[in-house]
From Swiss-Prot:
GO molecular function: N-acetylmuramoyl-L-alanine amidase activity
Name the UniProt record assigns to this protein: Uncharacterized 38.4 kDa protein
Listed GO biological process terms: peptidoglycan catabolic process
Domain MurNAc-LAA, first and last residues per copy: 3-173
Signal peptide region: none
GO cellular component: outer membrane-bounded periplasmic space
Entry-linked SMART domains: Ami_3
Entry annotated with the keyword Thylakoid: no
InterPro entries, alphabetized: MurNAc-LAA_cat, N-acetylmuramoyl_amidase_3
């Protein structure tokens, strides 16, 4: 039996992006599908195009499958519906129409993925307008592994790993032709589990009140480096900063399972809430905010008695802390004896 497999989209015509990036992840899954199908004696052709525009991307994959005279076409995707979603959305498959061989493959694939991962089963849906389904000359199935923005889905996907998903898709195909899969069941993705644990170790000290752009520079003329969601926790860096409306920070990049490189965020109180862990005490008038931990430092600003701030660290007799100035949050040095930690 001849099967054509492709990963959806490419890095010039990218797919969905949420907590994970569709194009990055479907590349992992489709390769795992191919590996398991070959191990089970199927003749497999990788019909994933290289980087190109979306129309070329779709046509090249379908043309390769048709020229191969494949008996089955499978395209791997990840879905997206919302900007952010905490609950489960699930796994599903698409076919051109019901009642044919494609539906049998699609049903077995989605059932096997759901049973093997606990992802919600969305079943088989039809869409005769999708290019991959209406231009192929063999039974064709689009697999939507899970939703990129669903925290529940992504947590499950990360725990189970792309190798298991690929195995389960191959198992569903085998079941459709009354064949028992002979590949070994992959173990839980220990690497991704470790990365998720690292996410739990990522120390934060601020909350985005609204969705924020991670910026490559502290200005309104910037490159958007990703997405910080409303209510997402981030880390304001322990660096002196007197820039109006901006602070250096990092955030957790779910698609890469790691802390981001330093970026800039809007520091206005209307969009950002920095934690507090200390109180200004015993100050009669004002406590100077300084650029350096020295009595000779120029003054950046000031805080008053009983004001709250976030202390990053204390060195000798000075505390580096983020405080709320009139324009937004800033970070400066303060004389530590006038600051009481919680």
């Amino acid at each position: 039996m001849k099967i054509a497999i492709r990963g959806g989209h490419n890095f010039l015509a990218k797919g969905a992006c949420g907590l994970i990036d569709e194009t990055i992840e479907d590349r992992k899954v489709y390769k795992a599908v191919i590996k398991n199908l070959i191990e089970n004696n199927f003749e497999v052709l990788d019909v994933t195009p290289g980087d190109c525009d979306i129309n070329t991307d779709l046509k090249l994959g379908v043309d390769k499958a048709n020229n191969f005279n494949a008996d089955l076409f499978i395209s791997i995707h990840f879905d997206k519906c919302y900007d952010k979603f905490d609950g489960p959305l699930g796994t599903g498959t698409w076919v051109c129409e019901k009642g044919g061989k494609a539906e049998i493959y699609a049903q077995n694939i989605v059932d096997t993925i759901s049973e093997g991962t606990s992802l919600k089963n969305r079943g088989v849906k039809t869409n005769a307008k999708l290019y991959e389904l209406n231009k192929t000359i063999m039974p064709a199935v689009i697999v939507e592994v899970c939703f990129c923005e669903s925290k529940v889905d992504v947590d499950i996907y990360r725990e189970k790993g792309s190798d298991l998903i690929g195995y389960l898709i191959a198992k569903g195909i085998c079941k459709s032709v009354n064949k028992e899969i002979s590949s070994d069941l992959p173990q839980v993705n220990l690497e991704n589990t470790t990365n998720s644990q690292n996410n739990n170790l990522f120390k934060t000290n601020a909350t985005a009140k609204v969705a924020l752009d991670p910026r490559d520079n502290p200005s309104n003329n910037y490159k958007d480096l990703g997405e910080i969601y409303e209510n997402e926790r981030i880390k304001i860096l322990a660096e002196v900063c007197d820039l109006k409306f901006f602070l250096p920070a990092t955030y957790w990049q779910d698609s890469l399972n790691k802390e981001s490189s330093p970026i800039w965020v809007n520091s206005k109180q209307t969009v950002l809430n920095v934690d507090t862990n200390a109180t200004v005490i015993n100050v009669l008038t004002e406590l100077d905010a300084r650029y350096t931990p020295s009595p000779d430092s120029n003054r950046m600003g000031y805080v008053k008695n009983q004001e709250r701030l976030f202390v990053h660290k204390i060195e000798n007799n000075y505390a580096l802390a983020t405080y709320l100035a009139s324009e937004g949050y800033k970070t400066a040095w303060f004389t530590a004896e006038y600051i009481k930690l919680d």
